[in-house]
A protein has these predicted regions:
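Positively charged, small/polar-rich N-terminal and surface patches that mediate targeting and assembly
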Residues: 1-97
Length: 97
């Protein structure tokens, strides 16, 4: 096992200007998969500035912080988001093949 970081992105799906969800959750998941590639996506509810919205928690392994920041910039533009939260977790991980 090697020590690496896992990143979890929290992507709200409500447009920052209209406060309405423009893209369906299933379509949003497909877009995230196109941008990020290998990841685990979990549907959840989140709150931003007191506003409840559908949120995707996106878990990413075996990537660098720079790659993750690049994904966030792309996703911010696509989903018209003010920000995307990034959680960085140090852990031991390996792929068993």
């Amino acid at each position: 096992m090697t020590q690496q970081n896992k990143y979890v992105l929290y992507l709200g799906l409500a447009d920052k200007d209209t406060k309405q969800q423009r893209i369906t959750t299933s379509k949003a998941m497909a877009i995230v998969n196109q941008v990020v590639g290998d990841c685990t996506i979990t549907k959840s509810k989140g709150y931003w500035q007191g506003f409840k919205e559908n949120t995707l928690a996106i878990e990413i392994l075996f990537s660098t912080l720079e790659q993750v920041k690049n994904y966030c910039e792309q996703l911010k533009t696509i989903f018209n988001q003010e920000c995307i939260a990034i959680q960085e977790i140090q852990l031991n991980q390996a792929l068993l093949v």
